[in-house]
Protein backbone atom coordinates (compact mmCIF):
# COMPACT_ATOMS: atom_id res chain seq x y z
CA UNK A 1 0.00 0.00 0.00
CA UNK A 2 2.80 2.38 0.83
CA UNK A 3 4.39 1.66 -2.56
CA UNK A 4 1.11 2.42 -4.32
CA UNK A 5 0.69 5.61 -2.33
CA UNK A 6 4.29 6.66 -3.07
CA UNK A 7 3.57 6.14 -6.79
CA UNK A 8 0.65 8.58 -6.55
CA UNK A 9 -2.07 5.95 -6.77
CA UNK A 10 -5.38 7.11 -5.28
CA UNK A 11 -6.92 4.31 -3.23
CA UNK A 12 -10.62 3.44 -3.18
CA UNK A 13 -11.98 0.87 -0.76
CA UNK A 14 -14.85 -0.42 1.35
CA UNK A 15 -15.43 -0.69 5.07
CA UNK A 16 -12.81 -2.57 7.03
CA UNK A 17 -10.14 -2.36 4.35
CA UNK A 18 -10.59 1.39 4.10
CA UNK A 19 -10.25 1.73 7.88
CA UNK A 20 -7.09 -0.40 7.79
CA UNK A 21 -5.55 1.67 4.97
CA UNK A 22 -6.27 4.91 6.81
CA UNK A 23 -4.80 3.47 10.02
CA UNK A 24 -1.49 3.26 8.11
CA UNK A 25 -1.71 7.00 7.48
CA UNK A 26 -2.56 6.52 3.82
CA UNK A 27 -5.53 8.44 2.43
CA UNK A 28 -8.34 6.33 1.03
CA UNK A 29 -11.61 7.25 -0.68
CA UNK A 30 -14.69 5.37 0.49
CA UNK A 31 -16.53 3.51 -2.27
CA UNK A 32 -19.72 5.09 -0.93
CA UNK A 33 -18.27 8.55 -1.69
CA UNK A 34 -17.90 7.55 -5.35
CA UNK A 35 -21.19 5.69 -5.73
CA UNK A 36 -23.15 8.05 -3.44
CA UNK A 37 -24.87 4.87 -2.31
CA UNK A 38 -24.41 3.16 1.06
CA UNK A 39 -23.42 -0.41 1.73
CA UNK A 40 -26.72 -2.31 1.99
CA UNK A 41 -28.16 -5.67 3.00
CA UNK A 42 -25.76 -6.14 5.88
CA UNK A 43 -22.74 -5.46 3.67
CA UNK A 44 -23.78 -7.87 0.92
CA UNK A 45 -23.92 -5.03 -1.61
CA UNK A 46 -21.04 -2.55 -1.51
CA UNK A 47 -19.19 -2.43 -4.82
CA UNK A 48 -21.88 -3.71 -7.21
CA UNK A 49 -22.49 -0.32 -8.82
CA UNK A 50 -22.02 1.19 -12.31
CA UNK A 51 -19.62 3.83 -10.96
CA UNK A 52 -17.31 1.05 -9.81
CA UNK A 53 -17.75 -1.44 -12.64
CA UNK A 54 -17.92 1.27 -15.29
CA UNK A 55 -14.56 2.57 -14.08
CA UNK A 56 -13.08 -0.91 -14.38
CA UNK A 57 -14.68 -2.02 -17.64
CA UNK A 58 -14.21 1.27 -19.50
CA UNK A 59 -12.10 0.70 -22.61
CA UNK A 60 -9.63 3.59 -22.55
CA UNK A 61 -9.07 3.46 -26.30
CA UNK A 62 -12.76 3.59 -27.20
CA UNK A 63 -14.06 7.16 -27.52
CA UNK A 64 -17.65 6.13 -26.81
CA UNK A 65 -16.67 4.55 -23.47
CA UNK A 66 -14.62 7.61 -22.50
CA UNK A 67 -17.54 9.93 -23.32
CA UNK A 68 -19.88 7.85 -21.19
CA UNK A 69 -17.64 7.78 -18.13
CA UNK A 70 -17.22 11.54 -18.43
CA UNK A 71 -20.98 12.05 -18.83
CA UNK A 72 -21.80 9.89 -15.80
CA UNK A 73 -18.81 11.07 -13.74
CA UNK A 74 -17.32 7.60 -13.44
CA UNK A 75 -13.70 7.51 -12.28
CA UNK A 76 -11.27 5.35 -14.23
CA UNK A 77 -10.05 2.44 -12.12
CA UNK A 78 -6.70 1.13 -13.35
CA UNK A 79 -5.79 -1.30 -10.58
CA UNK A 80 -8.07 -3.66 -8.66
CA UNK A 81 -6.84 -5.56 -5.61
CA UNK A 82 -9.22 -8.11 -4.13
CA UNK A 83 -8.88 -10.36 -1.10
CA UNK A 84 -11.83 -12.74 -1.37
CA UNK A 85 -13.82 -13.80 1.68
CA UNK A 86 -12.23 -16.92 3.20
CA UNK A 87 -14.80 -19.43 2.00
CA UNK A 88 -12.59 -22.54 2.23
CA UNK A 89 -11.25 -21.61 5.67
CA UNK A 90 -14.79 -21.05 6.91
CA UNK A 91 -15.89 -24.47 5.65
CA UNK A 92 -12.78 -26.09 7.18
CA UNK A 93 -13.49 -24.42 10.52
CA UNK A 94 -16.71 -26.41 10.86
CA UNK A 95 -18.87 -23.28 10.76
CA UNK A 96 -22.60 -23.69 10.28
CA UNK A 97 -24.17 -23.26 6.86
CA UNK A 98 -25.40 -19.66 7.35
CA UNK A 99 -21.85 -18.57 8.24
CA UNK A 100 -20.46 -20.48 5.26
CA UNK A 101 -22.98 -18.93 2.87
CA UNK A 102 -22.02 -15.42 4.05
CA UNK A 103 -18.44 -16.18 2.98
CA UNK A 104 -19.45 -16.65 -0.65
CA UNK A 105 -17.95 -13.47 -2.09
CA UNK A 106 -20.10 -11.84 -4.77
CA UNK A 107 -18.63 -8.35 -5.16
CA UNK A 108 -15.03 -9.51 -4.94
CA UNK A 109 -15.38 -12.23 -7.55
CA UNK A 110 -17.25 -9.80 -9.81
CA UNK A 111 -14.46 -7.23 -9.44
CA UNK A 112 -11.89 -9.89 -10.32
CA UNK A 113 -13.73 -10.98 -13.44
CA UNK A 114 -14.40 -7.42 -14.62
CA UNK A 115 -10.80 -6.31 -14.15
CA UNK A 116 -9.40 -9.47 -15.75
CA UNK A 117 -11.76 -9.06 -18.71
CA UNK A 118 -10.41 -5.54 -19.25
CA UNK A 119 -6.73 -6.45 -18.83
CA UNK A 120 -5.93 -4.19 -21.77
CA UNK A 121 -6.40 -1.27 -19.38
CA UNK A 122 -6.57 -2.66 -15.85
CA UNK A 123 -4.28 -4.61 -13.53
CA UNK A 124 -6.04 -7.18 -11.34
CA UNK A 125 -4.39 -8.55 -8.22
CA UNK A 126 -6.63 -11.37 -7.01
CA UNK A 127 -4.59 -12.92 -4.21
CA UNK A 128 -1.97 -12.04 -1.66
CA UNK A 129 0.47 -14.26 -3.59
CA UNK A 130 0.45 -11.57 -6.30
CA UNK A 131 1.32 -8.66 -3.98
CA UNK A 132 5.07 -9.14 -4.37
CA UNK A 133 5.01 -9.36 -8.19
CA UNK A 134 2.93 -6.16 -8.20
CA UNK A 135 5.35 -4.43 -5.83
CA UNK A 136 8.34 -5.55 -7.91
CA UNK A 137 6.67 -4.25 -11.05
CA UNK A 138 5.88 -0.90 -9.42
CA UNK A 139 9.42 -0.53 -8.12
CA UNK A 140 10.85 -1.29 -11.56
CA UNK A 141 8.49 0.70 -13.79
CA UNK A 142 6.61 3.10 -11.53
CA UNK A 143 2.84 3.18 -11.84
CA UNK A 144 2.88 1.88 -15.41
CA UNK A 145 2.41 -1.65 -16.69
CA UNK A 146 2.83 -3.48 -19.96
CA UNK A 147 0.08 -5.39 -21.73
CA UNK A 148 2.05 -8.59 -21.11
CA UNK A 149 2.15 -7.91 -17.34
CA UNK A 150 -1.56 -7.08 -17.20
CA UNK A 151 -2.38 -10.23 -19.17
CA UNK A 152 -0.33 -12.32 -16.70
CA UNK A 153 -2.25 -10.83 -13.76
CA UNK A 154 -5.54 -11.51 -15.62
CA UNK A 155 -4.56 -15.16 -16.14
CA UNK A 156 -3.72 -15.50 -12.45
CA UNK A 157 -7.01 -13.81 -11.54
CA UNK A 158 -9.05 -16.26 -13.59
CA UNK A 159 -7.17 -19.10 -11.85
CA UNK A 160 -8.17 -17.63 -8.46
CA UNK A 161 -11.77 -17.18 -9.64
CA UNK A 162 -11.94 -20.73 -10.98
CA UNK A 163 -10.51 -22.20 -7.78
CA UNK A 164 -12.90 -20.18 -5.63
CA UNK A 165 -15.96 -21.21 -7.64
CA UNK A 166 -14.79 -24.83 -7.61
CA UNK A 167 -14.52 -24.73 -3.82
CA UNK A 168 -18.08 -23.44 -3.59
CA UNK A 169 -19.28 -26.11 -6.03
CA UNK A 170 -17.46 -28.81 -4.05
CA UNK A 171 -19.10 -27.63 -0.83
CA UNK A 172 -22.58 -27.80 -2.32
CA UNK A 173 -21.82 -31.06 -4.14
CA UNK A 174 -20.57 -32.62 -0.93
CA UNK A 175 -23.48 -31.38 1.18
CA UNK A 176 -26.35 -31.77 -1.24
CA UNK A 177 -24.85 -33.80 -4.06
CA UNK A 178 -24.52 -36.94 -1.97
CA UNK A 179 -28.15 -36.68 -0.81
CA UNK A 180 -29.30 -36.02 -4.39
CA UNK A 181 -27.33 -39.00 -5.74
CA UNK A 182 -28.80 -41.24 -3.02
CA UNK A 183 -32.32 -40.04 -3.88
CA UNK A 184 -31.71 -40.68 -7.60
CA UNK A 185 -30.38 -44.17 -6.85
CA UNK A 186 -33.44 -44.91 -4.69
CA UNK A 187 -35.71 -43.95 -7.59
CA UNK A 188 -33.89 -46.37 -9.93
CA UNK A 189 -34.64 -49.37 -7.74
Predicted regions mapped to residue ranges:
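A short, charged helix-loop
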Residues: 79-102, 106-148
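Active-site loops and adjacent core secondary-structure elements that bind or stabilize anionic groups
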Residues: 129, 133-189
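Short acidic, glycine/serine/threonine-rich loops at helix termini
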Residues: 22-26, 33, 40-43, 68, ...
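Short coil/turn connectors at secondary-structure junctions
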Residues: 6-9, 24-27, 49-53, 74-82, ...
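Glycine-rich nucleotide/cofactor/substrate-binding loop typically near the N-terminus or early
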Residues: 16-87
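Generic structural signal for well-ordered, non-membrane alpha-helical segments
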Residues: 10, 14, 49, 62, ...
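N-terminal phosphate-binding or glycine-rich loops at protein starts, especially the Walker A/P-loop
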Residues: 1-30, 113-114, 120
Amino acid sequence: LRTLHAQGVELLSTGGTQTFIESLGIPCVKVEDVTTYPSILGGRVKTLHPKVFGGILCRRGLEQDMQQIEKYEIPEIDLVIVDLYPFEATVASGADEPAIIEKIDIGGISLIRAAAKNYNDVVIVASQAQYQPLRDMLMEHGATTSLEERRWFAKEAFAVSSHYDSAIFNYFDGEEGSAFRQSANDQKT
